[in-house]
């Protein structure tokens, strides 16, 4: 009897973990965008007017819980919780709920960045949060939850990143470290997440997951409610979970400890794609991209060119400030069949702490758009760049196809097909790519969705004529604006 019960428990746990890898996308949509620091009602409008029509699958939103108010309002204040009240500079609970409903209604899922590892760091005296709640972080007193000192790990600093105890029980950059093995802490975290599920979210990005023991997270995840069927989710659907685990290889706390609980952020993807498109690696090596590079299995990897953290760091990672290689890397990311894709939508920054665009009263301002739909007034909105949203459409058009017809010049000119539905070519050399290449597409004329759009049957950019054998003449000049060309069956002239 014990053996039967134990086996049943293992089967149920395994089923739950597999379910937590499902992002619950509509139809053939399969790309998430991180609308970093956007306000809730602005996201609702963006879902309806841009994201749904362009085929985006979901939005990662900034933390929703009340946070500390820091001088100058740096972006990272959102990662310093005071309580689990749903009031931030992005809006209140009513506005959040409206956003979730409106986005779900047009098939765009919402994933919340959640902070389960910690509360706010030290603050001189009494701290006040964005909902007006007071706390004394130095005393580990957070009455808005409530938490007191007994709910936290003892104070210590992470000085040795090879020491598991320090990584998981000491304070990450001084943030008060919650004890997730405590029944009380677990109950408050589950209550917080369940409330978001009730409001209709599809899942969670779990911040700083490697700083929490995987067995504690497994308990919390398995205790969550199923997704809300009133928002269009099937019965017994589990929340999609993707966990921030920074693992460059040979880490004491490994990504592999978390991958069965949900998807895991594949930071090596971000670093290596940056290396390649900065010219530090020949593009020909990308033929074995993905698990061939030692990355996580595709269905367990949350992939990205940059995120809100590493785009602010020096190193190989690309960001909007290097637009040509960034667009090329994004095109490859969305064309190659590996991982659960997320694209970044940023605001302009001059230093690590730059706040989102705000007015004189430190209120976040809404993005504004020019005649071409691009963002102005301090918002970058990479997701509105044609070269990015067009590749979201490409990824939708070629879903469930494999790589075929790989070609390279032995260096950094490459092309490949996605079945008979799509074709991508990239030129990262200092000389032109001019070649008859196999596009694998049916005969006809196709619009290059990178350089233009198909409007009323006409292409506003380059077009490529494909012959009866699937070949077309491909030209990408070394000084071309984008360095990439993309064709697919939904862009046939």
UniProtKB/Swiss-Prot annotation:
One of its GO terms (cellular component) is extracellular region. It is an enzyme of class 3 (hydrolase). The modification Pyrrolidone carboxylic acid is found at residue 20. Ca(2+) binds at residues 117, 168, 177, 211. Chloride binds at residues 205, 307, 342. It is found in: Secreted. GO terms for molecular function: 4-alpha-glucanotransferase activity; alpha-amylase activity; metal ion binding. Keywords: Calcium, Carbohydrate metabolism, Chloride, Disulfide bond, Glycosidase, Hydrolase, Metal-binding, Pyrrolidone carboxylic acid, Secreted, Signal. The record marks 309 as: Transition state stabilizer. InterPro entries: A-amylase/branching_C, A-amylase_C, Alpha_amylase, Glyco_hydro_13_cat_dom, Glyco_hydro_b, Glycoside_hydrolase_SF. It comes from the Eukaryota. Its cofactor is Ca(2+); chloride. Disulfide bonds join 47-103, 156-170, 375-381, 417-440, 447-459. Binds 1 Ca(2+) ion per subunit. Binds 1 Cl(-) ion per subunit. Its EC number is 3.2.1.1. SMART domains: Aamy, Aamy_C. It catalyses: Endohydrolysis of (1->4)-alpha-D-glucosidic linkages in polysaccharides containing three or more (1->4)-alpha-linked D-glucose units. The active site is at 207 (nucleophile), 244 (proton donor). GO terms for biological process: carbohydrate metabolic process. Residues 1-19 form the signal peptide. Monomer. Belongs to the glycosyl hydrolase 13 family. This is Alpha-amylase-related protein. It comes from Drosophila erecta (Fruit fly).
């Amino acid at each position: 009897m014990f053996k039967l019960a134990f086996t049943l428990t293992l089967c149920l746990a395994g089923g739950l973990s597999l379910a937590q890898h499902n992002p619950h996308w509509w139809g053939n949509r399969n790309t998430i965008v991180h609308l970093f620091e956007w306000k809730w009602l602005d996201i609702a409008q963006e879902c309806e007017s841009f994201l749904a029509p362009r085929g985006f699958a979901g939005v990662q939103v900034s933390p929703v819980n009340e946070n500390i108010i820091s001088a100058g309002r740096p972006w990272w204040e959102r990662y310093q919780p005071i309580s689990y009240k749903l009031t931030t500079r992005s809006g209140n609970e009513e506005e959040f709920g409206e956003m979730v409903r409106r986005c779900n209604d047009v098939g765009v899922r919402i994933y919340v960045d959640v902070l389960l590892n910690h509360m706010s760091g030290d603050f001189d005296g009494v701290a006040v949060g964005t909902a007006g709640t007071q706390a004394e972080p130095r005393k580990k007193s957070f009455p808005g939850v409530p938490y007191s000192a007994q709910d936290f790990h003892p104070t210590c600093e992470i000085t040795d990143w090879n020491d598991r105890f320090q990584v998981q029980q000491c304070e990450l950059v001084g943030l008060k470290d919650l004890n997730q093995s405590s029944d009380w802490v677990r109950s408050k975290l589950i209550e917080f997440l369940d409330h978001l599920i009730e409001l209709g979210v599809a899942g969670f990005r779990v911040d700083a997951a490697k700083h929490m023991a995987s067995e504690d997270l497994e308990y919390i995840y398995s205790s969550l409610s199923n997704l809300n069927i009133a928002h269009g989710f099937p019965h017994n659907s589990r929340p999609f979970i993707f966990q921030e685990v920074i693992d460059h290889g040979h880490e004491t706390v490994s990504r592999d400890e978390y991958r069965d609980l949900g998807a895991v952020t594949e930071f090596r993807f971000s670093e290596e794609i940056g290396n390649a498109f900065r010219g530090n690696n020949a593009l020909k090596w990308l033929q074995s991209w993905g698990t061939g590079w030692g990355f996580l299995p595709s269905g367990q990897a949350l992939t990205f060119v940059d995120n809100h953290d590493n785009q602010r760091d020096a190193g190989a990672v690309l960001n909007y400030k290097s637009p040509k290689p960034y667009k090329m890397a994004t095109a490859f990311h969305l064309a190659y069949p590996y991982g659960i894709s997320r694209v970044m939508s940023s605001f302009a920054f001059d230093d690590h702490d730059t706040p989102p665009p705000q007015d004189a009263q430190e209120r976040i301002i809404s993005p504004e758009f020019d005649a071409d739909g691009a963002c102005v007034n301090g918002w970058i909105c990479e997701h509105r760049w044609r070269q990015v949203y067009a590749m979201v459409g490409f990824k939708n058009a070629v879903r469930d196809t494999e790589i075929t017809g790989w070609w390279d010049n032995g260096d950094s000119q490459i092309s490949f097909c996605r079945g008979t539905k799509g074709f991508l070519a990239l030129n990262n050399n200092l000389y032109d790519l001019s070649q008859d290449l196999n596009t694998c597409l049916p005969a006809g004329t196709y619009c290059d969705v990178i350089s233009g759009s198909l409007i009323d049957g006409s292409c506003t950019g380059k077009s490529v004529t494909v012959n009866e054998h699937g070949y077309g003449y491909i030209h990408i000049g070394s000084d071309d604006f984008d360095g990439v060309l993309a064709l697919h069956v939904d862009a046939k002239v």
